[in-house]
């Protein structure tokens, strides 16, 4: 009896959502393509009328030759007040700040009422990176992706993260499940709910974010941390998962995870020395000893994927004043704390080369502006 009443309630809510989407120019399908604690993501279709009035939407969908989008519906009744006040606005603002990068999921528009918020997003139809790694591993009868494919995908991911950092955004929840693939196999970084704006490069944060398996050791130790360096640790975990088919450290308890981290990653036989060196460089226990994005871009393992780049690095950080309405994580409850970053030199001669591409080349891998 109770389950029947729940089904009727769900049907009523879905009908309301269909009506609200229709009123805003979208045909909501019943196909659910994702879900979170208090949100669901559905496949939807943009109407011709909506595309006429939304240049961002029409320019992107023209290139894709379809009208499909993903609509994320957040239940404001189920979401905690902190999520509605802090995390949802950060997600929206970070997606707006990173608009046009080809490896970051595009936000076309938002609308809301007292009960729900709707985010109209670019559709990435081939699932997430974790699903892709598992599917390829099954086909190959060997764990992980081949290094050439891992290199191609990792280039795109590094490009997306470099662009985020260049506009002052740290993601803080980088993991395989938050990296989607579109129908052409391109990476689409998503889920910016924990993203934060850092006005100064060496600002320190203190909020524990993300999944333990991808979380930097300084965060596990409850220390204040540099968000960019924490993102770099997560990149190392993701690369290891790509080429090995499994996470390098897996424990639910932070103190046990730290013990595994101190022992260092274990690599599968046959993995190239260059790839091992890059992963070790990213998974340094001490944040200041970790490779930065400039060094990642210049690493010898990355060189064969140079064709993925498009323009120039070392560009000055762009300031996005739209973030001024959202308090950075280190203002509440944290105090504004900064440190001078001392970057150690790389221990491996294979890691850097002055002839390799610079970071601006990574940051600028975005889509051209739509034609007017």
Swiss-Prot record:
Its EC number is 2.7.11.1. Residues 343-358 have a biased composition (Low complexity). Residues 314-372 are annotated as: Disordered. Transmembrane segments: none annotated. It is an enzyme of class 2 (transferase). Its cofactor is Mg(2+). Keywords: ATP-binding, Developmental protein, Differentiation, Kinase, Magnesium, Metal-binding, Nucleotide-binding, Phosphoprotein, Serine/threonine-protein kinase, Spermatogenesis, Transferase. GO terms for molecular function: ATP binding; magnesium ion binding; protein serine kinase activity; protein serine/threonine kinase activity. May be involved in a signaling pathway during male germ cell development or mature sperm function. This is Testis-specific serine/threonine-protein kinase 5.
